[in-house]
Amino acid sequence: MRANPHPLLTALAAASLLLSACNSQNDSNSANAVSPSGASVSSSEVTTSNPNLKLDLSCDDATFPSTLFAQCEQTNVAHTFEATQEQLNPAFQQRLQAQNAANLQASLERSINDPSWNLPPAYGNTGVTPLCAAGFGPCVGDPFRYPGVDGPDGNTFYQKEAEVVPVVYYDQGCARISGHVWRPRNAGNKKLPAIVVKNGSVQASEQLYWWAVQALVRDGYMVLTSDPRGQGQSDAATPTGEQGGNLNGAVFFQGLVNDIDFLLSSPNKPYPHQAQCAGTYPTKTASFNPFYDSLDANRIGLAGHSYGAGGVTWVQSYDAPDSKPWPGLLTKKNPVKVIVAWDALGSRETPNAATLTSLAGSGSAGALPSNPLTAPTDAPPVSARVPALGFSSEYGFTPVPFVRKPPREEHLAAFNQWSAANVPVMQITIAGTTHLDYSPGFGLPASSWCPKIENNACVGGWAKPMILHYTLAWMDRYLKNPDEPGYADADARLLDDTDWASRLSFHFASARKFTTRNGQLIQSDDIRALYR
């Protein structure tokens, strides 16, 4: 996407990166405040966890155009180049190249052992397509998070912390879906809450989300990951040629319903599409969830990125009075209890609300476009049915400085829909982030996610720790039982802004509205403004 050169870009380029960041903290107490947008916020949210937190909101208040706006924006957009700079580390490059070779070898061996994965070219499967079928380059994700890698996120995780089983199962069109089921090791007889993770489009593969999956497993969750039809190691098309991926956005919600059915399946309730499609290919396919005996079917959550965030927004809507009935085949009612949408939670007006660019508003050209030839035609109307946490990026796919003063409430459409329905909701926009902060991979513009390599693992980062903090706290708040780790302090984690308020966007308001377990209503349409 191109824009005519703007004179402000020259000023931005010349602005000093050493100027004080707009998000500094000091130890003054916060009281009732007025947000930069003029909306009132409640001092009751300044909890005992962060009573002395105060932010410098000069960047929030900066007018456009101005020298201050240019200085703030120059510092902010610099975050989007951190990841690619970190990846020049020789230790990262060495591990990446080793995993490139290992993934390519595994892909070739799969094709040799089961040639049916090499479908006629018209179907799109060739051994190295779909794009991430061979799992190299950006498709590797974090190269330290694979079995066989010495380190806490490699061998230690797979041998001591988790059980991970690869699975292949059919979708409703008899395309093969490649995925994994994960659970904490030594779960014993415990019934576990479960999360289904749905990839983004543009060929994102499941490995790009293992950074979040490992954290969920460590937090006590069973997790189902897979590549949607048309992406990664799944079939590019059905046997009749029906496409997936961006050519058929329905796979991001219809496929998610299939995923939920597979999660719920057991020997007594086999996965329905297995019987329908068995024998289509010689590939060994699963009839049921291998960890069915550990699943608590009453505690299921969803997390999705990009088109997958649109998918979780749609799927949670099923069974709402103003939407469509639940289409799953193993339960009569929608079993989803909570969702997290990584860029972004959709609204009825804009179901796919992902930020694509800083050059246009996210409610218009910046939102995920719908091709009238391929856009879903039977998606359920978006309805606020279950608690939802939404994240939005600032720069989308284009790490280009803002040449406008965006409306502060621009990312709050879904928040407002959930809030009006009195359904718990939280919306977070992290400063200096791109759409690819949620699917980090080699060469992809994003904020820092591997600033240090310690014990053969990526440590630290800008947005990643914050995304994990709120994702885990939100899931724990609505899925954990009282006797499980994460239950007791979930509310406190959602309200503890000490480490994170300074990383919230100064362009766009972040907001929250939910009731704590002790009955306190928490409501703010601008979290940063609490700490003026």
Predicted regions and their residues:
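C-terminal motif of bacterial Sec signal peptides marking the signal peptidase cleavage site
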Residues: 18-21
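Alpha/beta-hydrolase-fold serine-hydrolase catalytic core, especially in secreted/extracellular enzymes
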Residues: 38-121, 431-436, 440-532
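N-terminal cap/lid segment of alpha/beta-hydrolase-fold proteins
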Residues: 119-190
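Short substrate-entry loop that stabilizes the transition state in hydrolases
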Residues: 187-192, 197-235, 348-349, 398-401
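Alpha/beta-hydrolase active-site loop
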Residues: 245-297, 314
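Short glycine-enriched nucleophile-adjacent loop
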Residues: 264, 309-323
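The feature captures the conserved acid-bearing segment of alpha/beta-hydrolase catalytic domains
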Residues: 327-435
